Design a protein with these regions (language model features):
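ATP-dependent carboxylate-amine ligase
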Residues: 2-158
């Protein structure tokens, strides 16, 4: 778990959590939070699709805003991956376009989370953690949640 502090009036945490139990542990470790919780998460391609709705439901249970995005889609359709998360989050009570957003471009998803954050909020960037690449159908691409988050914090909250 990495806390990003660029002097912004809200908290940003980057964590590798990508399995249901790991997500639960992240939310348990946070405890009660006074501001909103904004979670950015996606699922890897060629991994167990049955966990996607479960993870969507976990995100919905603990978050005020969930942004579903890409995460190492490999050769699997990112839209298809996102569908599983959305189904779980909707079943748990979230509404697409209201408190549940699909933004498959991970950088844009992080930007949206940072732009949306207000003083006292908590932004969770989940699933990639320390990784320095994102795996797409055409191969690996340089990508770091921490660098992207810092870029948009500096742009919108300095």
């Amino acid at each position: 778990m990495n806390i990003i502090d660029e002097g912004q009036p809200f908290t940003v945490i980057v964590d590798y959590a990508h399995a249901p139990d790991a997500l639960e542990k992240v939310f348990d470790s946070i405890g009660a939070h006074k501001g909103r919780i904004i979670s950015v998460h996606g699922g890897a391609g060629r991994r167990d699709p049955s966990t996607r709705p479960i993870r969507g439901a976990i995100l919905a249970k603990y978050s005020d805003l969930v942004i579903i995005t890409e995460d190492d889609s490999r050769d699997e359709d990112p839209e298809k991956i996102a569908e599983g998360f959305i189904k779980g989050a909707e079943k748990a009570g979230m509404k697409l376009g209201k408190d549940l957003i699909k933004e498959l471009d991970r950088e844009k998803a992080i930007k949206l989370a940072i732009e949306s954050a207000k003083p006292g909020d908590l932004v969770l960037l989940l699933g990639k953690g320390h990784e320095k690449t994102i795996l797409r159908a055409d191969g690996p691409h340089d990508f770091e949640d921490i660098k992207v988050a810092k870029k948009y914090i500096r742009q919108y909250h300095q």
